[in-house]
From Swiss-Prot:
UniProt keywords, alphabetically: Cytoplasm, Meiosis, Nucleus, Phosphoprotein
Protein name per UniProt: Meiotically up-regulated gene 166 protein
Region (Disordered): 118-144, 162-189
Top-level taxonomic group: Eukaryota
Listed Polar residues bias regions: 170-189
Gene name, Swiss-Prot/TrEMBL: mug166
Biased composition annotated in UniProt, kind: Low complexity: 123-138
Subcellular location: Cytoplasm; Nucleus
Stretches of the chain forming a coiled coil according to its record: none
KW Phosphoprotein (keyword) present: yes
Residues carrying Phosphoserine: S184
Single GO cellular component term: cell division site
Signal peptide span: none
Provenance organism: Schizosaccharomyces pombe (strain 972 / ATCC 24843)
Purpose: Has a role in meiosis.
Amino acid sequence: MPRRAVLFRGNSFISFSSISSGNESSAHGDASLGQADKPLTVDVLDAWTTQFTKKQTRVFHEAYVSAYIDLQQKYARLERLQEQILNLERSLLNYKSLKSNSTTTVATVPSEKRYFFRRKPKTSSTTNSLSSSSSSVSHMNQDANPNSTVLTFTAVPYDSCLPAPDRHTPSSASSRASETGTTSPQSMRNQISLLYSKVDQVKTEIASAQAVMHDLLRTYPGSESLQQSTHTQF
C-alpha cells in the first residue's frame, strides 16, 4: 500500500492522496488517515462537496486548510527541536573528544618554555655564518654597537614553540569553555533533557492535530466539527 501524503494545491484545496508528482508539494504522511478504499483527491473532494451547500463547502475547505496548516506547523516545530538536540549532542561529543586530546597533549608537552624567536649575542663567528646563510639578516649595520643583538630564525617545530602550560591554569580550549556556563557539559545535558521533554509535548500536540484531520476526513460529510462550524457561522 503506497504511503499517502497531505498535498497542497494552490490556495483552495488540500487533499489527502497517494499521488506524488514533481509539481506538488508533499508534506508529512499520516497512515491513520489513509485507510479509505479510495484515496482522497481534489476530484473526490469536489464530488463530495457538491452534496453540500455553498456555505457548507466553504466551511469544510476552511476547516480542512486550518487543520492542515496546524498539523504542518507542529511537524515543523518538531523538526526544529530534533535539529537542536542533534547539534547539542554533536557539541557534547566534540567537547569530550577535545578534552581527551588536550589531556594527552598536556601530559606530553615538556616543561621548558620555547619561543619561535631566539636572541643570540652578535659575534664575529655569528656574523660570518649569517652572511653565508640565505635566510640570515645580512644587511645589518657593521658599525653597530657590539653589545647589540640580532634575531636568528631556527628550524624549531611550531608545536614545540608553545610555552609550557601553567599547572594552575587550564590550558585547553575545552577547559576554558567549561568555565562558561553556556557551553559546559552539564549545561548541554540540561538543554538536551529540556528539549526532549518539549519533543514529547509536541508529539502529543501532533496526535491531537491528526485526530482533528481524522475527524474531518473519515467522518465526512457528517463531521462533528464541520456541523458545529456550519451552525456557528451566519
